Amino acid sequence: VAKLYNMLEGDAGTTSMGRTAVDNETVRTVYVIRPDKRIGLFLTYPMTTGRNFGEILRAIDSMQRTAKHKIATPADWKPGEKVIIVPKVTNDEAKKIYPDGWETIKPYLRKVPDPHK
């Protein structure tokens, strides 16, 4: 996959044999490819820092929810926690989508339960 997306030099070979960590440094970037073949997220880690798979999975959970619902996820959000109704959704439209209502923090910040529960 790294070769397919040109993350390694063209002459890097077809296997990892003979390559060092320095040769593979460009693969320190994590890409999440959406179903439409576009990059949905990329995170680049220094060679000295391990990847945080919990964060990668959290971001994927967020992207899946926000693709299906008119929501956004707040900072430090975890699956199952409240989400934000995107500002472009009017209150009238929100009443149809969320008949049980929502918590209003600011006019542009309305929270509802995670629809994926």
Regions from the PLM with identified roles:
Residues 1-117:
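Chalcogenol-based redox active-site neighborhoods
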